[in-house]
């Protein structure tokens, strides 16, 4: 079975094509969240490079979050539309799990973090594996709270940090953890679409109808939070 995987949850947009679980094409671009413009051309290129026609895709996958609210919606909406048009099922993939899957050759506790703004990170923790072994659930917390929870499950392990949150919080992480902190190099920090495709393939028996594929948010979008604050202020 052929699979098309899409990620637009962060600053890097990516598309992968898989044939029976093997990656036939992977492409990604740092495009400053202009995913609505670039995604469909990237999908067309992925299909062409993988030697696939859209009619040959049997399963679609999208990263459902956490991540940029707008970015996640773009990828999920694109996959829902393609799956609906083709009458094919979908698989949602967790962004933090996919990040961890890209760091499978380490004995450290894998700590994917994304900059959630407002002084928070989206974070979780995993041990290496495919799929990764989850040690902490997804959370939206201030960095110190997240680090406390990661340390509580790390045991004697070092902690390996990756994801776009590293750029924002690297100094704070190193200051808190010292030599226990392993900062992934830049080329390993971002989510790879091939990891999305491989996780989707492993979960293909859990595929759903396009109507059931939905973004997964760890907190309300900023506009909703601001509206709630305004309404609360009037009470």
Where are these regions (language model features)?
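Surface "functional belts" at beta-alpha junctions
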Residues: 22, 34, 89-190, 217, ...
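Glycine-rich phosphate-binding/hydrolytic loop that grips phosphoryl groups
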Residues: 186-217
